[in-house]
Amino acid sequence: MSNEENIKSDNKSGDSSDLPTIPALDIGAEECDLLAELKNLTLKRPFDVKKLSPKVTKRVLFLKDIQVTHDELEEKFLAEKSALEATYDNLYKPLFAKRYEIVNGVVEAEAEKEGVPNFWLIAMKTNEMLANEITERDEAALKYLKDIRSCRVEDTSRNFKLEFLFDSNLYFKNSVLSKTYHVNDEDGPVLEKVIGTDIEWFPGKCLTHKVVVKKKTKKGPKKVNNIPMTKTENCESFFNFFKPPEIPEIDEVDDYDDFDTIMTEELQNLMDQDYDIAVTIRDKLIPHAVSWFTGEALVDEDDSDDNDDDDNDEKSD
């Protein structure tokens, strides 16, 4: 006897009084056709409400009214949230300005005029995500980093810009390296465009490329054998952050099928990683830089992860 037959047999012989009573569904032919069509529904073929019965149509329209009200409230919430964030961004600015002065020795704060050496480099390397992006070659250039700032591009949008302020150094001419993120909010937050600074490297100082020396054996006398050949290749560097992945413009693509083809999984992963790094800098590093410098933020983050694990364990129990 199969498991299914055993179950049926047990149900017949057992007391049905302790089984939950399931109300019968009054489904007519029209509703059956509706369920079949909904099952085969695709995003490219929206369901026609006119095919419903008058009673069900009335209910669906009422549900749509509820959804409209919800969307209006959500839009109001996001606007008020954006305004509140803008207000507090302005309150934070004087504090970040004082931090800049102390880190860079502009004011004494009962310390030496040299400020806090390698403040931002150490703070960044304490964060695991950022540390993974920084190579040993990068460190010499990042020692010239004076400040990292975040600002809104437009007060009522999710667009934001990160600015890295550098002292005069031996690596590049730019005093500021920036990265701007444009987010489309019309149909939910979608990363639309990312713009990074073109770094003006001094000759022989580019950290995003490396020169590879190869030996090419040439036929002939021994004196001309093993001629050294040089080749420039891309290499890992934090400064690749300012050269973001290129996002295809939707307007330039014929339809969403073509867009999905262009947006390969690899490109999507690169975009996600790039955005995660930017948000980490904006939401974690900049507001709590001194805690990352001292390592306290790392301890707090570990404690937060432990609490999340405990909460998950309780839910599973």
UniProtKB/Swiss-Prot annotation:
Alphabetized Gene3D superfamilies for the sequence: 1.20.5.1500, Nucleosome assembly protein
Region annotation Disordered: where it falls in the sequence: 297-317
Known tissue expression: Expressed in the root segment covering the apical end of the differentiation zone, the elongation zone of the root and the mature pollen within the anthers of open flowers.
GO biological process: double-strand break repair via homologous recombination; nucleosome assembly
Residue ranges of the motif Nuclear export signal: 52-67
Compartment(s): Nucleus; Cytoplasm
Biased composition (Acidic residues): 298-317
Origin: domain of life: Eukaryota
GO cellular component assignments: cytoplasm; nucleus
Keywords: Chaperone, Cytoplasm, Nucleus
GO molecular function: chromatin binding; histone binding
Motif Nuclear localization signal, residue range(s) on this chain: 214-219
Similarity-based family: Belongs to the nucleosome assembly protein (NAP) family.
Subunit: Can form homomeric and heteromeric protein complexes with NAP1;1, NAP1;2 and NAP1;3. Binds histone H2A.
Domain notes: The acidic domain is probably involved in the interaction with histones.
Function: May modulate chromatin structure by regulation of nucleosome assembly/disassembly.
Protein name: Nucleosome assembly protein 1;4
